[in-house]
Amino acid sequence: NKVLLETVVLALGTNTVDNYESLLNQFIAKLPKGHRLILVTPYDGRTAHDGTSIAVKTRQYELELAKKYDYVFVADWYQTAIQHPEIWYGTDYVHFGSETTTITKGGELYAQTVKQAIDEAVKKGTVKK
């Protein structure tokens, strides 16, 4: 029906996307006026502390975009993931949870991270002009 909600959430980068800058720039350019964008930072625990990894570089670029555009916000899943090592035990360090408790906890943390960014964006009220 060609309806796009005012707040758009985009998660990009856990699977290696070498042209992340180009893709993010295109998405921002094509985002219609009257909308805001929430970028969910990627997390890959295998390379989380490697500044040369694509996931880390993607996160850095997303943080830069949020500073550049007042209608772009960040749901920093990377930061949340780093702060909660308990959800990664027994996993591939990309997909949280190795049993019901940690799967549930990881899902709740992810949802809370995105919701906090949405709440902040809506409170600020800025959209693309």
Model-identified regions with their sequence ranges:
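Catalytic His-Asp segment of secreted/periplasmic serine-dependent ester chemistry enzymes
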Residues: T47-K129
